[in-house]
Amino acid sequence: AGARLAGAKQLIAVDRHDSKLEMARAFGATEVLKADESTRAEILKLTCQRGADYVFEAVGSPKVQEASFGSVRPGGKLVLVGLSPMGSETDFPGSIITRQEKTVLGSYYGSCDPQRDFPLYAGLYLDGRLELDSLVSKTYTLQEINSAYSDMLEGRISRGAILF
């Protein structure tokens, strides 16, 4: 939804879980791909062999971060949103970053300015231009927290919320 508001025309979503791909399509993805060994080739095919202008990696796995880098076009940006485990390392080839002028950057909490951005997002939501309610696919009580965690790990939900 946010990428659409920013003017993106082609949005390719990649995930291992069908529920998250369905949600991505509902929120504006033009193509959805099941994550596997052919993902990079599929992204290149969908982008006429260019690669993606922006890749947002939200898993936090160094292996996935490295694979995501290969889907970025020369001059494009890889934005690391997912938190990697403390002490883990991700290997990006410096010579390719330089020669292809790719950018790798981190984004914590959306790199937002809460005083400026939260009122903007609230206004977009209240105006009906930013759909948020559908992000939560299931709610849980505090007593159901273990089930919520299990559902999240197993990919049975897109997003869960604990209500207390």
Question: Where on the chain are the PLM-derived regions?
Answer:
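N-terminal Rossmann-like NAD(P) cofactor-binding module of classical short-chain dehydrogenase/reductase
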Residues: 56
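Helix-to-beta-strand junctions that scaffold the AdoMet/dcAdoMet cofactor pocket
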Residues: 72-74
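C-terminal hydrophobic helical "lid"/dimerization subdomain
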Residues: 66-70, 115-164
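Rossmann-fold dehydrogenase core element
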Residues: 76-77, 92-134
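Short amphipathic alpha-helix with an adjacent loop that forms part of the alpha/beta core around
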Residues: 38-49
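Acidic carboxylate diad motif detector
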Residues: 81-82
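Mid-domain Rossmann-like dinucleotide-binding core that forms the NAD(H)/NADP(H) cofactor-binding site
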Residues: 1-37
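Local beta-strand N-terminus motif with an aromatic residue
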Residues: 29, 51-52, 132, 145
